[in-house]
Amino acid sequence: MCRHQPRARLSPDEQLAAEESFALYCKPVELYNIIQRRSIKNPAFLQRCLLYKIHARRKKRSLITISLSGGTNKELRAQNIFPLYVLLARPTNNVSLEGHSPIYRFSRACLLTSFHEFGNKDYTEATFVIPDVKNLATSRACSLNIILISCGRAEQTFDDNNCSGNHVEGSTLQKLEGKCFWGKIPIDLLASSLGNCVSLSLGHTVEMSSTVEMTPSFLEPKFLEDDSCLTFCSQKVDATGSFQLQVSISAQEAGAKDMSESPYSVYSYNDVPPSSLTHIIRLRSGNVLFNYKYYNNTMQKTEVTEDFSCPFCLVPCGSFKGLGCHLNASHDLFHYEFWISEECQAVNVSLKTDSWRTELLAEGVDPRHQTFSYRSRFKKRKRVEISSDKIRHVHPHIVDSGSPEDAQAGSEDDYVQRENGSSVAHASVDPANSLHGSNLSAPTVLQFGKTRKLSVERADPRNRQLLQKRQFFHSHRAQPMALEQVFSDRDSEDEVDDDIADFEDRRMLDDFVDVTKDEKLIMHMWNSFVRKQRVLADGHIPWACEAFSQFHGQELVQNPALLWCWRFFMVKLWNHSLLDARAMNACNTILEGYLNGSSDPKKN
């Protein structure tokens, strides 16, 4: 059932915009319909196993309390009735032998020792939980019976160790073999009396009484030890001496306490005629209003569902709380606001455009041409953990790339094997004097540790034959490569001409029209630096910024505009969590050293 909110006076353009705004609900709803159709054949989980579904079923059960009143049983003496055992049992079959009752299997037994006006409450009431009386006729519980057993021996004692409250273990009933009086109250008869009771649906307690015919019989507990079963034989005792017992029965819904806490459940039905009360309660039970907001939340359309059902997939959720769990877990493309009052239970639904904007396709666009993200589960590898004490004093080391032999020798000397088998660089600081001078001087490379490479001799001969059949081209020059170049240890990707790279970088930056000259210069300096120093990962950014501040510090302090561009760039890196406060402070300390004219800025 859907209801439109009366529209205000809108112009034709505004009405068209409002309709387009409401049409945005169609895409997510269509997606949920597709998911729902697929889940029918291959469900991801069973609805009945959800925790809020289980709680909802438990709240719909009925709580039955059995007690005896001394006022209605004045003709009977207490010593002839008590102790009275009350059992909730089900017949194992409908076939019974002559003179025998059906064999009953019980799940719970309670003990009453006095009338409910006297004595301890634990031993004056027997409480059982049965399914909802509305669904009792179609469930297995329709064959349940409340069985009352009186041995008529007041002097009989019972073991407290076998009693928990008024709950009695089966070992105690094994001692009751012999003459007794017994009677039963069929649950289906009780359900027929409670089914038309309106007060029970409102969470109130219903009081009623029942007359039970207690007939003499002989209790045979031969099945108690194994199956918790018992039967009664009427041939072994005199059939005379039966009596009637007035039993007080109170019933209420198991979730009545939780219902009384809800404002929606305390609605007053005083003005409702008794003839329409049942119909009104049925209509109000489980009804939820969904208000769909659109057109900047200025307009809405209302839909009503029954039995706490979801409006998108029509799944009954059992309770208002369960409905909230279902909507937030299964339909998170919308934003929900839940509110409840004495008049209604409602949910305000609005679009959460940011969460599904990238998932929906534009009009007329082929889905096969859309970019999608894929995450592969790589095999987890054991990482070698290096303690912070071992890497605390590591600093970036910049060397001249003009002598690759020296760089390789320095790399072998600066890396040593620690006790845990991991390679850690020694603390080495390049003199500040080597960083002064021209900013675009001879190319420099960052010192790295030894890298293990796969030699040609260790390669698979079959792979070598396959490589010989293909033609390879240089990564930068796009010229055919000889086999010797293909199988060499050098990678053509690493053969970068710094002069050409700087020229291409400057030409690319010159095409920018919305940046200043100083911004172009700082971008070119940074691009050139990270290329020559091989800054390859996000974790390299902190030491790269320190090295950049030290390498270009003299030029930065001579140009205040360029210095501010560099500091603004560091703030950008900090906003993206690529640069921490410690590294930024170290960079500013280095720059302040150059401003103060210090010969070694890193000491300041």
Swiss-Prot record:
Polycomb group (PcG) protein. PcG proteins act by forming multiprotein complexes, which are required to maintain the transcriptionally repressive state of homeotic genes throughout development. PcG proteins are not required to initiate repression, but to maintain it during later stages of development. They act via the methylation of histones, rendering chromatin heritably changed in its expressibility. Polycomb group (PcG) protein involved in the repression of flowering under long day (LD) conditions. Regulates floret development. A zinc finger (C2H2-type) spans 310-331. The keyword Transcription regulation applies. Residues 454-589 are annotated as: VEFS-box. Widely expressed. Belongs to the VEFS (VRN2-EMF2-FIS2-SU(Z)12) family. The gene is EMF2B. InterPro entries: EMF2-like_DUF7651, Polycomb_protein_VEFS-Box. Keywords: Chromatin regulator, Developmental protein, Differentiation, Flowering, Metal-binding, Transcription, Transcription regulation, Zinc, Zinc-finger. GO terms for biological process: cell differentiation; flower development; heterochromatin formation; regulation of long-day photoperiodism, flowering. This is Polycomb group protein EMF2B. Disruption phenotype: Dwarf phenotype with early flowering under long day (LD) conditions. Defect in floret development. Disulfide bonds: none annotated. GO terms for cellular component: chromatin silencing complex; nucleus; PcG protein complex. Residues 396-440 are annotated as: Disordered. Component of the polycomb repressive complex 2 (PRC2), composed of the core PRC2 components FIE2, EZ1 and CLF. PRC2 methylates 'Lys-27' residues of histone H3 (H3K27me3), leading to transcriptional repression of the affected target gene. GO terms for molecular function: chromatin DNA binding; zinc ion binding. It comes from the Eukaryota.
